[in-house]
UniProtKB/Swiss-Prot annotation:
<feature type="compositionally biased region" description="Acidic residues">
    <location>
        <begin position="76"/>
        <end position="110"/>
    </location>
</feature>
<feature type="region of interest" description="Disordered">
    <location>
        <begin position="1"/>
        <end position="116"/>
    </location>
</feature>
<feature type="compositionally biased region" description="Basic and acidic residues">
    <location>
        <begin position="16"/>
        <end position="44"/>
    </location>
</feature>
<dbReference type="GO" id="GO:0006338">
    <property type="term" value="P:chromatin remodeling"/>
</dbReference>
<feature type="region of interest" description="Disordered">
    <location>
        <begin position="131"/>
        <end position="167"/>
    </location>
</feature>
<feature type="compositionally biased region" description="Acidic residues">
    <location>
        <begin position="142"/>
        <end position="161"/>
    </location>
</feature>
<dbReference type="GO" id="GO:0005634">
    <property type="term" value="C:nucleus"/>
</dbReference>
<dbReference type="InterPro" id="IPR019098">
    <property type="entry name" value="Histone_chaperone_domain_CHZ"/>
</dbReference>
<keyword id="KW-0143">Chaperone</keyword>
<keyword id="KW-0539">Nucleus</keyword>
<feature type="compositionally biased region" description="Basic and acidic residues">
    <location>
        <begin position="131"/>
        <end position="141"/>
    </location>
</feature>
<comment type="subunit">
    <text>Forms a heterotrimer with H2A.Z-H2B, stabilizing the association of the histone dimer. Also, with a lower affinity, forms a heterotrimer with H2A-H2B.</text>
</comment>
<comment type="function">
    <text>Forms a chaperone-bound H2A.Z-H2B complex that acts as a source for SWR1 complex-dependent H2A to H2A.Z histone replacement in chromatin.</text>
</comment>
<protein>
    <recommendedName>
        <fullName>Histone H2A.Z-specific chaperone CHZ1</fullName>
    </recommendedName>
</protein>
<feature type="compositionally biased region" description="Basic and acidic residues">
    <location>
        <begin position="60"/>
        <end position="75"/>
    </location>
</feature>
<dbReference type="GO" id="GO:0042393">
    <property type="term" value="F:histone binding"/>
</dbReference>
<comment type="similarity">
    <text>Belongs to the CHZ1 family.</text>
</comment>
Length: 167
């Protein structure tokens, strides 16, 4: 019972199954048809595509819009009233927005608002003390600069005196 004694049967490579041949023919005919479609102008009117809405609210809105369109086609005079209604609705919405903004501002605690000075992370800074400290630091730096300048002047005077003596 060795593996070598059994011959392995392989299907012939040249023959293709019937299904593959059929799919190739279909793909050729499909590509030919697509070329024909591209060349021939379409006589059918393209439909306007609209996104589908599944919500009940959207259905209600569509019904209302349809009613409005029907009403506009029936009477042009009523269209003027519709415009007035739309203006009123717009103004009403504007007023509601302002009321909401005022309500939001009322919720803010006024004690947390910093009215003067710089914003710090909760730390209260006395700016007069800070200014004095800065002046002191600047004064110390200025004093050091003055001392260095005085030392340089003394060295320059010494150098000048030495030059005079040597001449």
């Amino acid at each position: 019972m060795s593996d070598e004694s059994k011959p392995i049967e392989e299907p012939p490579i040249e023959s293709k199954p019937q299904e593959e041949q059929d799919t190739e023919k279909e793909s050729l005919t499909n590509s030919e048809e697509s070329k024909k479609r591209a060349v021939e102008p379409s006589t059918d009117k393209k439909k306007k595509r609209r996104r589908r809405n599944y919500d009940e609210e959207d259905k209600e809105l569509e019904k209302e819009e349809a009613k409005e369109k029907n009403a506009k086609t029936e009477n042009n005079e009523e269209g003027d009233d519709d415009e007035d209604d739309e203006d009123d609705d717009y103004e009403q919405g504007k007023l509601e927005d302002e009321e909401e903004e005022e309500d939001e501002l009322l919720e803010i605690d006024e004690s947390n608002i910093i009215t003067t000075g710089r914003r710090t992370r909760g730390k209260v800074i006395d700016f007069t003390k800070a200014a004095e400290e800065l002046d002191k630091e600047r004064g110390v730096v200025a004093e050091e600069d003055e001392e260095e300048e005085e030392e340089e002047e003394k060295e320059n005077e010494d150098d000048d005196f030495k030059e005079q003596v040597q001449n």
